[in-house]
Amino acid sequence: MEKKNTYSKWMAVVLLACVCGLVSCRAEYEVAKVEGTRVAMDATWDAEPDKDALALLEPYKAGVDSVMGEVKGVAAVSMDRFRPESPLSNLIADVLRQAAAGVLGRPADVGLVNVGGIRNVLTEGNITTQNIYEILPFENSLCVLTLGGADLKELCANIAARGGEGVSGLNLVIDAEGHLLEAKVGGQAIDEGRTYTVGTIDFLAEGNDGMAALTRASQRQCPEGATLRGLFMDYVERETAAGRKIEARIEGRVVMKK
C-alpha cells in the first residue's frame, strides 16, 4: 500500500497594497487592499532540476537513502490518527506511558499525545526509518509529570474540549460539544486526594494545544535526548526483536456520545 503523504502541498501568498500618508515628519501606512491566492507546491516549480544542485547532493544521497530506508519492523495493520480516538494515537500514547514508567521505575498512570503532532499514517507492511520521521517529524521530547487528582480531572476536561487526543491509561466519555461526561484512570474514578503520573511531550507539558492543567504539575522530569521519535523507534525495534508485529486498535479509550 502506498504511504499517504498528508503534508500540505499549498503555500498561501498574500499581497498587501499600502497607501502612505504624511503626518508631520513621519510616514503612516494603511492597508488599502488585500489579495490572496494559493500556489501548488508541486513539480511545476521544478520541471527542470538544477543540474549543479543535483551534482552537489549526489555524493550524500546514497548514504541518506540507506539510513532512511532501513526497515525497523512490520506493521500488522494500517493505523491512522484522528479524533476522538484512533489506533495510531493509542499506540504512541502507550509508548509515552511505557517510557514514563522507565523514568519513574514504576508504572505510570497516564500517557498523552496530541493528535496534531502525528503527521502521517502508519500503513501495513514494512516500517522504515523514513516512515517514522514522516509520522513524528518534530523534536518533541518526553516529559513525566505528577498531577493532583483535581488537576488530572481538569486535564481530562482539556482533552474533551479538543474532541479527544491520544491517551493511555484513561477512559473518557465526552460529548460532541466538548464536555467531559466521565473520566477514569485504570478503570477507577479519579481520586482528588491522590497524585497521578503522566507521560507526555514537552510541547503539551508547556500548556500548548489547550492542555493548561499540565502546567500545574507538582513534579516534572524531562530526560535529555528522549525524543518521542526515538522512543517510538526503540519500541518498534524491541517488538521486532521479540518477533512481534506492530499493531494497535480502537479500544473505547475516548468515547463520544451524540
Regions picked out by a protein language model, each given a short descriptive name:
Residues E2-V14:
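Bacterial N-terminal signal peptides that target proteins for export
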Residues R81, E85, S89-A93:
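An accessory alpha-helical subdomain
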